[in-house]
Amino acid sequence: MASNSWNASSSPGEAREDGPEGLDKGLDNDAEGVWSPDIEQSFQEALAIYPPCGRRKIILSDEGKMYGRNELIARYIKLRTGKTRTRKQVSSHIQVLARKKVREYQVGIKAMNLDQVSKDKALQSMASMSSAQIVSASVLQNKFSPPSPLPQAVFSTSSRFWSSPPLLGQQPGPSQDIKPFAQPAYPIQPPLPPTLSSYEPLAPLPSAAASVPVWQDRTIASSRLRLLEYSAFMEVQRDPDTYSKHLFVHIGQTNPAFSDPPLEAVDVRQIYDKFPEKKGGLKELYEKGPPNAFFLVKFWADLNSTIQEGPGAFYGVSSQYSSADSMTISVSTKVCSFGKQVVEKVETEYARLENGRFVYRIHRSPMCEYMINFIHKLKHLPEKYMMNSVLENFTILQVVTSRDSQETLLVIAFVFEVSTSEHGAQHHVYKLVKD
């Protein structure tokens, strides 16, 4: 299975993202420019649902129509509040908020006890972002909605972990949902992370006394490498500029704070039998270390695609990593059934310097035929409990190493169930330990 190189796409555009003119009409009886609390709340929700996409269009799978991001935000406000805001008003509001965020960030950076080089890098990073990116990055920390509750003691026993689906409304980890209009009006759902991998969300102001990065122990990150995004998807192209996309699983970029709790721990020995035990297996890798590089991700996969597949459907995987070091990484992905390796794909990726950090992207890597056939067969099972029974013995092990030194940088064990949520794919992350 050949390595798949990444080709850069156009970067996210500015806040103005034009679409059809259908919403540029009268403003009901609401004064133009007045953003009441209910409008502002709906605006913030929509920012979290629809990531910046430049001048590209988004297709709603249940309608098949193309929309610019700002028009989708305007539609969302109308549907939630009954009040009209045009896409141009949305664009203007985004720019006003972005200028405010820039001023706040500049004041905060200048007041910190940092050397001038660090201050300059932070300000340059901000300057390289569009208004839409700045506002969307900051909305991840908005205070409108508390985080959704996470299921507790999922791993209290091995059997409980493998057989118990989470309670409705408690599937952990937010994920992209492009069908917000079916949701109840209140309470609102937790904000959902952007899915585009072309920018890194604006980081919170770091603590001067911090000895480790804010993302370590709170995200999938070792001392050498951090996973920024991971997704497996099916895509159908409508024409050269538009496509419909369905996410089976997705880990979006996050913006952790030092106040966030560390990841829950799971004993790695609980899952040894789910992965190969021979040379290069999970047990041998963990004994080799380093221990802070090992993570478990439980996915609740979304198989409810409404997209017509057809012969031109593309099944792929994209992932993105970042590091303070420039190196060449090797990414091994092993698909396992009943603890035995079925197929393996090894890809090589090189560093790209972006905003003071080295970024590694594996973009639209084609799925192997085994995986595509597996998904097709799984979707045709009549009941979800049957799907989960099959998935109980299906796992994926991803191992990222330095190609030159062979050092283990990151190991992620993926396990799966089928999502029962109307909000699409969900996930929860654990760190693997050995007490």
UniProtKB/Swiss-Prot annotation:
UniProt key word Transcription: yes
Keywords: Acetylation, Activator, DNA-binding, Nucleus, Phosphoprotein, Transcription, Transcription regulation
Domain of life of the native organism: Eukaryota
GO CC list: chromatin; nucleoplasm; transcription regulator complex
Function description: Transcription factor which plays a key role in the Hippo signaling pathway, a pathway involved in organ size control and tumor suppression by restricting proliferation and promoting apoptosis. The core of this pathway is composed of a kinase cascade wherein MST1/MST2, in complex with its regulatory protein SAV1, phosphorylates and activates LATS1/2 in complex with its regulatory protein MOB1, which in turn phosphorylates and inactivates YAP1 oncoprotein and WWTR1/TAZ.
One Gene Ontology term from the biological process aspect of the record: embryonic organ development
Comp. bias intervals (Polar residues): 1-12
Bias-annotated ranges (Basic and acidic residues): 14-28
Organism (species): Homo sapiens (Human)
Name of the protein this chain belongs to: Transcriptional enhancer factor TEF-5
Localization terms from the record: Nucleus
Modified residue annotations for N-acetylalanine: 2
Tissue expr: Preferentially expressed in the placenta.
Residue numbers of Phosphoserine PTMs: 148
GO terms assigned for molecular function: DNA-binding transcription factor activity; DNA-binding transcription factor activity, RNA polymerase II-specific; RNA polymerase II cis-regulatory region sequence-specific DNA binding; RNA polymerase II-specific DNA-binding transcription factor binding
Subunit structure: Interacts with YAP1 and WWTR1/TAZ.
Gene3D superfamilies (alphabetical): 2.70.50.80, TEA/ATTS domain
Residue spans binding DNA: 28-104
Coiled coil regions, renumbered to chain: none
